[in-house]
Amino acid sequence: MVLQARSKHRDAAPRPPRSARSSPPPLSGASEVDAGELGSERTPPSPGRRGAAGRKGPRAGTAAPAPDGLAGRLAAGLHWALGLRRGRGRTWSTLLLASFAALLHWSHITHLFENDRHFSHLSTLEREMAFRTEMGLYYSYFKTIVEAPSFLNGVWMIMNDKLTEYPLVINTLKRFNLYPEVILASWYRIYTKIMDLIGIQTKICWTVTRGEGLSPIESCEGLGDPACFYVAVIFMLNGLMMALFFIYGTYLSGSRLGGVVTVLCFFFNHGECTRVMWTPPLRESFSYPFLVLQMLLVTHILRAPELCRGSLIALCISNVLFMLPWQFAQFVLLTQIASLFAVYVVGYIDTHKLQKIIYMHMISLVLCFVLMFGNSMLLTSYYASSLVIIWGMLAMKPQFLRMNVSELSLWVIQGCGWLFGTVILKSVTSRIFGIADDAHIGNLLTSKFFSYKDFDTLLYTCAAEFDFMEKETPLRYTKTLLLPVVLVTVAAIVRKIFNDMRGVVAKQRTHTRKQQFEHGELVYHALQLLAYTALGVLIMRLKLFLTPHMCVMASLICSRQLFGWLFGKVHPGAVVFAILAAMSIQGSANLQTQWNIVGEFSNLPQEELIEWIRYSTKPDAVFAGAMPTMASVKLSALRPVVNHPHYEDAGLRARTKIVYSMYSRKAPEDVKKELMKLKVNYYILEESWCIRRSKPGCSMPEIWDVEDPDNAGKTPLCNILVKDSKPHFTTVFQNSVYKVLEVLRQ
């Protein structure tokens, strides 16, 4: 590498405070041409078997025309997949628009990230400190593989890690869903070796003068810098996600205008849709784009008259790509399976199609189980139990049909069978395998409806992202007209369901109904929206599923299946552009607010702490403290820690409870005894953790009062140690934020 040095002053721009982050025609007969082509001649629906909404693929026994050349065959395949009717040219123009959307989103999030952190001018240490909490923990494993003598040696190191939960040796690849870091590290090593081989410079390094009496730092730009490479790949992936959203909206609505609506709604509500521009290394940044692909494939499978093996295989692969990077993915897929089962129960999916979907989910779950080295949480999840119960109920369909009950009663029986069967099977499998890692999820949900409280639950609910959805959120949706448009589309779907169901629910003999309703993909999306709404209302962080799905649902405002009666009177383009113009009033203001966020990352107290640890402690010195700080200590100081921010493991939760007893009202000798069992040498005490609280009852001493009522009313231990750490501890380092206490062994 060529090292260039020059003095370069930063623009220390002030950073403003960030805002909290007549009767309609029959549906099957509606014309399915692009809503933007009202003036062109339309072809009436073909007789014979009717396909699902918006699909104009070849009928059974009819082959698509075979174009010449590979490019032509690819174009034809995409032409049929997108459900567009205008030929190869329209397919390529659709892909061109999708590519433009991807480029636009990549540029947008890259610009926001750079504006917020001034990332390109930070030193290596500052970049690592900018990855706070979980982000720093995940990035540390990428760094381990990148800096290892070889790729395989690096993978072995993270599979036999004793720095993360000292003195335990754990397989972090199994525990923390680290396949993204493994893949990115391999790409980085390949990229740098190839560039070195052909003599192309991959990074340029500068000497940056920081001013204010601070020492100069070296700052490197380019993909040859590990942090820059890591972030760049994440932003490229999430840029491609916007292309998927455009194709998704186009396919669901049957109109490219629907794709435009989806993309613009996403941009106008960007702060509610994603946080990748502020927190790139989080698991959702790697995982969510594959959920978008997976839902697009589910939509295609539901709409297609005949099942295609390629679509099912693609669904299985996208499931794996969604689940591998993120432990929470199984809960999202649970809502999808529940929605699909409900669509089946009311008659919009046939048994064979749902069985195939269930099989693909089962296969992908087993593949993830194997790739995660037998992570038993996957097999004992509600998702796995739900798959087994639905599979069993599909096999029992003949028995259900022989029941002499009304259609509505059969729905209730099947719904209750799924619900209680899933809960019971999950409970049984968890007991058999002795798994309690996801017990905190049940406790968290219980606390939302009842007055249940415990230490772990309060750590979650006292964080804003795990609280209920903010009351201002629906208002923000309304200002951009996203909520009103979605309500209109949902009302149209509900009207369609009501028309389909009339006369069916009253039937007393369930086996007499042979009709299979059409447009199951519309009903599925409405139910999935309902599930995401429930998640988003209960846990604010999960609105990151709700808002993008609302953007997809908004595309249905262009659907002739739902609004053909309106588009017969008014040009659809006029309606859609009027709506977009109204949306853009608040939407452009939201974008401007994001663009106005200008700042520069700096955390001098933590920088002092890390430098002191590097040069004043032994490499095997063991640290304990607040979870976010421990991630930075492990990443930048490379010291063993006993706790970390990945809170989904029962053993880690028990460790963290011991470490956080420093903020309780317990006696110092009792706390010291427990820390010594964990072989802790140094404890990093932060006074702010002792006094701050996000809301009443949420300071650390108040949380401990719930867990340890016997000591309630006593002075918190942290307050005592801030004044005088002796005789059980001794202060070895202190600045304005951190106080490092050595645990005395005598």
UniProtKB/Swiss-Prot annotation:
Region (Disordered): 1-68
Residues found modified as Phosphoserine: 28, 31
Keyword Cell cycle carried by entry: no
Phosphoprotein as UniProt keyword: yes
Superkingdom of the organism of origin: Eukaryota
Pathway involvement of the protein, from the record: Protein modification; protein glycosylation
One Gene Ontology biological process: protein C-linked glycosylation
Residues annotated as transmembrane: 137-159, 227-247, 257-279, 307-325, 331-350, 357-374, 380-396, 405-425, 481-501, 520-540, 562-582
Reaction(s) catalysed (UniProt annotation): L-tryptophyl-[protein] + a di-trans,poly-cis-dolichyl beta-D-mannosyl phosphate = C-alpha-D-mannosyl-L-tryptophyl-[protein] + a di-trans,poly-cis-dolichyl phosphate + H(+)
Key words of the record: Endoplasmic reticulum, Glycosyltransferase, Membrane, Phosphoprotein, Transferase, Transmembrane, Transmembrane helix
Annotated membrane topology: Multi-pass membrane protein
GO annotations of cellular component type: endoplasmic reticulum membrane
Positions with biased composition (Low complexity): 59-68
Disulfide bonds: none
GO MF terms, alphabetically ordered: mannosyltransferase activity
A Pfam match: Dpy19
InterPro entries named in the record: Dpy-19/Dpy-19-like, Dpy19L1
Enzyme class (EC, first level): transferase
Role summary: C-mannosyltransferase that mediates the C-mannosylation tryptophan residues on target proteins. The reaction occurs on the luminal side of the endoplasmic reticulum and involves the transfer of a mannose unit from a dolichylphosphate mannose (Dol-P-Man) donor to an acceptor protein containing a WxxW consensus sequence. C-mannosylates the first two tryptophans in the WxxWxxWxxC sequence motif in thrombospondin (TSP) type-1 repeats of UNC5A. Regulates neurite extension during development.
Protein name in the entry: Protein C-mannosyl-transferase DPY19L1
Species assigned in the record: Mus musculus (Mouse)
Gene coding for it: Dpy19l1
